[in-house]
Amino acid sequence: MKEIISRHKAGEQIGICSVCSAHPLVIESALRFDLNSGNKVLIEATSNQVNQFGGYTGMKPADFRDFVYGIAQEVGFPRERLILGGDHLGPNCWQNEPADTAMEKSVELIKAYVAAGFSKIHLDASMSCADDPTPLDPMVVAKRAALLCQAAETTATDEQKRHLTYVIGTEVPVPGGEASAINAVHVTREQDAARTLQTHQAAFRALGLDEALNRVIAIVVQPGVEFDHTQIIHYQPQAAKALSNWIKETPMVYEAHSTDYQTRQAYRALVRDHYAILKVGPALTFALREAIFALAQMENELISPEQRSRVLEVIDEVMLNEPGYWKKYYRPTWSQAMVDIHFSLSDRIRYYWPHPRIRQSVEKLIANLNNVTLPLGLISQFMPVQFERLSEGVLTPTPHNLIIDKIQDVLRAYRFGCTPDVA
């Protein structure tokens, strides 16, 4: 990370896409995409996904590390080009508890991530706990972030500290996505970004963490990009011009969250304007979902009814029977909720892919289609971009390859934005 930031600050229009997903096919797609490029790949876990208690994935930080390393070994991707990051590390998961208890758990969370070898750490203590006022005083946020940084510094070995980096600040929606429709987005004011930096500098120095300040590489801000279930708010460079200019006077860059579904030109503009770390998550699993749905349509054309996976029906049954991950996010009317379940840009389906019934049906779908030849016309009908790549001779038409390539369509847009010499 430090090398990428140094190159950016030296004037090179370079950035990095942060892959925020625990789905094995998404991680495989990212690693295969850059297998021969020489580029680093940044993969991040959030505190609610992965923590010392297991998170909703059931993985602790060391488990997630081993999970990613296992995929890298299968792909042949060298570990030295992998960067592991932790996102929203702080009391996010324990906001319903008193601040003292939540911060004790947050300190242990940080220690677990650093001990597992994660080198990019987002120190996010912005959320109010059960006995806190709302919103929190910025100095309280900074002091708590400093305590988290102290935990990281005492845990890291001297060798780890050579690569350890921190991200501070937060001006993002709740981790996991917006719960309601958006109409406009407030772009961070440059004076607020400056205050974030100043309060954190003061809090770090008060704990004797002057050396750690040199490891702070980025500030999270809102440059004016967002999405909800049906809408995308696109980047408007002019609206963020003052913010973009301010960061030039610091040794840092910005980190932008919720950059999913922006255009490839927007990614290039964001990197040009010093939002050099671009987070993406739901857009990747949305592409995965599109690929699974497309393959299900092909299966209906090629496989006899009694042999089909029924994957779309299984998804519906599971999500309707177990609505915990989507109910408070989607519209209450049944017909509208079904559209959201299938096609929402926030892609709450992503929480259901590990479900045993859904996983088994996806495996059967892929097995069924592996046993037949996929007609080019059928691929053209349901996956036209992949059909073009087949025609160019750069893709072999297996179900697995089609899924991987579909996810990589998203990554191609980020590569265009993050790599100046890509046309």
Swiss-Prot record:
The keyword Iron-sulfur does not apply. The keyword Lyase does not apply. Gene3D superfamilies: Aldolase class I (3.20.20.70), putative tagatose 6-phosphate kinase domain like (1.10.400.20). Transmembrane segments: none annotated. Keywords: Galactitol metabolism. One of its GO terms (biological process) is phosphoenolpyruvate-dependent sugar phosphotransferase system. InterPro entries: Aldolase_TIM, GatZ/KbaZ-like, GatZ_KbaZ_carbometab, TagBP_ald_GatZ. One of its GO terms (cellular component) is plasma membrane. Pathway: Carbohydrate metabolism; D-tagatose 6-phosphate degradation; D-glyceraldehyde 3-phosphate and glycerone phosphate from D-tagatose 6-phosphate: step 2/2. NCBIfam families: agaZ_gatZ, PRK15052.1. Component of the tagatose-1,6-bisphosphate aldolase GatYZ that is required for full activity and stability of the Y subunit. Could have a chaperone-like function for the proper and stable folding of GatY. When expressed alone, GatZ does not show any aldolase activity. Is involved in the catabolism of galactitol. Belongs to the GatZ/KbaZ family. GatZ subfamily. Forms a complex with GatY. PANTHER family: D-TAGATOSE-1,6-BISPHOSPHATE ALDOLASE SUBUNIT GATZ (PTHR32502:SF12), N-ACETYLGALACTOSAMINE PERMEASE II COMPONENT-RELATED (PTHR32502). This is D-tagatose-1,6-bisphosphate aldolase subunit GatZ. It comes from Salmonella dublin (strain CT_02021853).
